């Protein structure tokens, strides 16, 4: 089994880039099996800005205060998860 990290930037791809979910579907059809771990950094950043919550980074990692963690959980288990599942289903992948 392969574990694939699908970053938030990959999910926010522009129209002229290949759909990462379509790439995964082709690998699945070729017999590869994998688990997807998703990120959501850009979506988290947007929600933090919307709520006027400051977020800082240290050595490339988000410093996650309790207030920031509440937003992170909300975004990752809400809109991002639903978007990933919907995108997987659209290309025929089980989710």
Regions picked out by a protein language model, each given a short descriptive name:
Residues 1-95:
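Nucleotide/pyrophosphate-binding catalytic subdomain
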